[in-house]
Amino acid sequence: MEQSSTKQTINIDDGDPPLIRKGMHSCMSQRSPETSVPKRARASSANSRWGRSTKFRKTYFPDATKEMWNDWHWQVSHRITTLAQISRFLTLTTEERQALEQTEGSFPFSVTPYYLSLIDPTDQASALRKSVVPSILELFTSPGESEDPLHEENTSPVPGIVHRYPDRALFLTTSFCSVYCRYCTRSRLVGGHTEPLETHWKNAIEYIRNTPAIRDVVISGGDPLTLSDEKIEWLLKEITSIKHVEMVRIGTKVPMVLPQRITANLLRILKRYKPIYLSVHCTHPDEITAESSKACNSLADAGVVMGSQTVLLKGVNDSVETLMELYHRLLKVRIKPYYLFQCDPITGSEHFRTTVDEGKELIRGLRGFTSGYAVPQYVIDTPGGGGKVPI
């Protein structure tokens, strides 16, 4: 989820710095008009997503009413977590079966029925499938990879707090996510058993209270929006009662994987403590559905300020067409494209990582071809705990 940054500048300039623009103009002049503008993702693929979850529910969960399907508790309690379960829904390859068997004891597999409804059941190469279904390549460790590449443990003064930057603190409130991303930076932490939340939280909040330099608290995990309304309100009340805390952010993927969680009561809670800033983890245009759009627009109506975080993933979203479609759709649901992250060197993630030069080329393919609001900042979270570096 979210890591606080040394730089918070959002580029809303439609152009490029003169030197970059000059080089880009030279490059563009060599292209025909037909190839100057990147081709948009086909509308048909986007339109096919609307209503998919309803068809999926009726096919695979015929006893589930519409009300049950739209209850986030039902979605969480019916998560698909085993090889036997996922085999009912997807035509698995031999490699996928082996991966599910061999990764079971290390990094859990979990996907909500809703999110599974967005995944192609037969195409192993489909983007969302790659992002959540284990790969046999996870079992191989490449040079430079580690379980804690950002050295968060080294900057954790008390359990649950990462205090890397002077005025910002990361508060890891839970190890639970409704859907586990296979490239997760905190795969070492998520999915396991933790100490009682009350003890964990009270010690963390006491640290924030006793550290006046902290003005910005990032609530993360796991996914904090999978907590109950009561726990979320308790956290927000405690944190916002600290006088030197000026800003509260929440890092989450819930609007994309569990949009049913954005209930009227949760919106009332968030509105009560506004402004709340939401860093929404978005991976691919296929996540922007009728359900996720409704959730995001409801959050915006409640006064929640939203920016996106996208991890650049080989074979998932590493094309100008895919990123442009994603960012245009995010803007339509009032999420500002904020960060595009180079994939962290987490153990077993080499198959997801592009080169930095490839990432820079993607940004060049966006800048100048679409509005500045649709161009995120490309950053590397430097290994060893050095913080974010814009590219």
Regions found by a protein language model. Name each.
Residues 156-159, 169-172, 203-207:
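Short, charged beta->alpha transition segments
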Residues 361-391:
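C-terminal accessory regions of radical SAM enzymes
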Residues 2-163:
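Flexible, acidic/Gly-rich N-terminal and inter-domain linker regions that tether
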Residues 171, 217-219:
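Hydrophobic positions in the central parallel beta-sheet of the AAA+
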Residues 202-216, 225-370:
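Conserved AdoMet/S-adenosylmethionine-binding subsite of the radical SAM
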Residues 183-185, 230-231, 262, 391:
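Short acidic, glycine/serine/threonine-rich loops at helix termini
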Residues 163-198, 250:
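Canonical Radical SAM [4Fe-4S] cluster-binding loop centered on the CxxxCxxC motif
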Residues 174-175, 187, 221-222, 253, ...:
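Fold-independent oxyanion-binding glycine-rich loops
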